[in-house]
Amino acid sequence: MRDITPDICDQFEDQVTLLNLPLQNFGQRTAFHGEIVTVRCYHDNSKVREVLEQDGTGKVLIVDGHGSCQKALLGDQLAILGIENGWEGIIVYGAVRDVAQMSQMDIGVQALGTCPFKTEKRGVGEVNVTLTMLNQIVQPKHHVYADWNGVLISKEALDF
């Protein structure tokens, strides 16, 4: 994979903002981008599953798990679901699990960290809402660009 975010910053510096979160890469695809779809949830990944069941062609799911690493909001089964439905990547402001398997899967995955515990399944959460993570705003329908160097957000799709 090539580094995409430095090139984007060089070419579109005034059109992007840095999503300054301490994220780590867990998927095989370490550079990915797409239109943002959002989920806000806490210790319940029901809405994550609902969204990943939809067509994700050209899209990246950003999950606001309130920064909690006490339950994993994404595991190998949901990552497989994302791959089957064409998602470019998933960014979790929280924890993931099954990371050995996920590292072999052709999908971008970034998260704060790992946790072996699964979440509850109560159908709780919000989809396509504005997220605020560490005082940074993420809007649905904006665009995200992620790699080892960081995560960038733009209002429009960038031709790079």
Swiss-Prot record:
Keywords: Lyase, Metal-binding. GO terms for biological process: regulation of RNA metabolic process. Substrate binds at G75, D76, Q77, L78, R97. Coiled coil: none annotated. Signal peptide: none annotated. One of its GO terms (molecular function) is metal ion binding. It comes from the Bacteria. Its EC number is 4.1.3.17, 4.1.1.112. SUPFAM superfamilies: RraA-like (SSF89562). PANTHER family: 4-HYDROXY-4-METHYL-2-OXOGLUTARATE ALDOLASE 3-RELATED (PTHR33254:SF4). NCBIfam families: NOT-MenG (TIGR01935), PRK09372.1 (NF006875), PRK12487.1 (NF009134). This is Putative 4-hydroxy-4-methyl-2-oxoglutarate aldolase. It comes from Vibrio parahaemolyticus serotype O3:K6 (strain RIMD 2210633).
